[in-house]
Regions:
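Glycoside hydrolase catalytic-domain context in secreted enzymes
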Residues: 1-288
Length: 288
C-alpha cells in the first residue's frame, strides 16, 4: 500500500556545468568522473538499491550523457549495478538534438537515448517508435527491455494490485494541520538575509510615503527554488499583495514588472524606472 520508489538524480556530473549554465558540458577526465561524480551514485545504489534514476542534461568531456551507452549502460548498470528503470529529465532527450546537436532529428534523438538505456521519456522524442520499428530504424528489443524494466518496478511496488493506494490514508498526511504548520515553519526559516545595510530592515514606515515594488517576481507566488510551476497559483500571498495588505493607506505602493524572467525585451523597463523615481524606496524582486 502507498509504496513509492526514490529516484536519485541527475546522472551523472550534473552539478558543475561550464560557466554555471544548466545543460552546459562538464569537463574533468576519467579520474574526476570516478572519484567525484560517480561516488554518490555508487554509494546510493550499493546501500539502498533504488528502483529509478533520472538522467542529466549535461555532456561530460563532450559526450552527451543521456545518449551514451557508456554512461547509461556500461557504467550505470555494468559497474554500479543499478537494476531499476531510467527516466529522462524534462527535455533531456530532445536536447540531444536541440542543444548537443548530435542528431538533426527528434526521432533519432529518441532512438539514441533508448538504445543508450533511457527507459522512460518525458518529452515527445519516443512518440514515433512504432513507426521506426516498422521502418527498420529501431530494433524492438530495446523497447521490450525498457518496458520490462518499468513493469518490473511497478510489480515490485504492487501497483497492479493497488494502483491508487488509500486516499483516506493520504488525506491524513497531505495538507493535514500538522504538515501545513511544518511547511510554514520550514518556509519561514528558509528566508536568508544576506545583508542589512544601514539597518534598513525592518522598515521604518515613518520615513517612507511611497514604495516601488518592481521585478518579475514581485507579484508571483514562488514557493521555493525551481518552483516555477506554482508561479500563477491563486493560493498564497505575493510580495505585492502582502505589502499592500500590511501598509494599507499609510504608504503609496507603485508596482511594475520591469522585465520578464527569460527575455531580452526592454519594453517594460521604462515603467519600472518611472515607478522607482517617483518613490522613496524600491523593493526589487528578481531571480529564477
Amino acid at each position: 500500500k502507498n509504496r513509492i520508489t526514490c529516484m536519485p538524480k541527475h546522472f551523472v556530473a550534473h552539478g558543475t556545468p561550464s560557466g554555471g549554465l544548466n545543460c552546459a558540458q562538464v569537463s574533468g577526465g576519467e579520474r574526476e568522473l570516478r572519484s567525484l561524480y560517480l561516488y554518490p551514485f555508487r554509494r546510493v545504489i550499493k546501500e539502498t538499491n533504488p528502483l529509478a534514476l533520472m538522467t542529466c542534461y549535461s555532456a561530460y568531456d563532450g559526450v552527451a550523457i543521456t545518449g551514451s551507452p557508456y554512461y547509461m549502460t556500461d557504467i550505470l548498470r555494468g559497474e554500479l549495478g543499478f537494476k531499476g528503470y531510467v527516466y529522462s529529465d524534462w527535455g533531456s532527450v530532445d536536447r540531444l538534438k536541440t542543444f548537443h546537436a548530435i542528431t538533426p532529428e527528434t526521432d533519432e534523438a529518441g532512438r539514441l537515448a533508448l538504445e543508450a538505456g533511457v527507459d522512460l521519456n518525458i518529452d515527445s522524442a519516443y512518440d514515433n517508435f512504432e513507426r521506426m520499428v516498422q521502418e527498420g530504424r529501431l530494433d524492438i528489443k530495446y523497447i521490450d527491455l525498457a518496458v520490462r524494466r518499468i513493469l518490473t518496478v511497478k510489480f515490485q511496488l504492487g501497483l497492479f494490485d493497488a494502483p491508487y493506494g488509500d486516499p483516506k490514508a493520504v488525506s491524513k498526511v497531505v495538507r493535514s494541520a500538522e504538515k501545513v504548520a511544518l511547511a510554514k515553519e520550514i518556509a519561514d526559516e528558509s528566508a536568508i538575509l544576506l545583508e542589512n545595510k544601514n539597518q534598513i530592515l525592518p522598515l521604518d514606515l515613518a520615513k517612507y510615503k511611497s514604495i516601488a515594488v518592481v521585478g518579475p517576481n514581485s507579484n508571483q507566488t514562488i514557493y521555493g527554488d525551481y518552483a516555477w510551476t506554482t508561479r500563477d497559483t491563486k493560493e498564497g500571498v505575493t510580495l505585492l499583495q502582502g505589502l499592500k495588505e500590511v501598509l494599507g493607506n499609510k504608504v503609496t505602493v507603485r508596482h511594475a514588472e520591469g522585465c520578464d524572467w527569460w527575455s531580452s525585451k526592454k519594453d517594460k523597463i521604462a515603467e519600472a524606472v518611472e515607478a522607482v523615481r517617483g518613490s522613496d524606496l524600491a523593493i526589487v524582486a528578481v531571480g529564477t
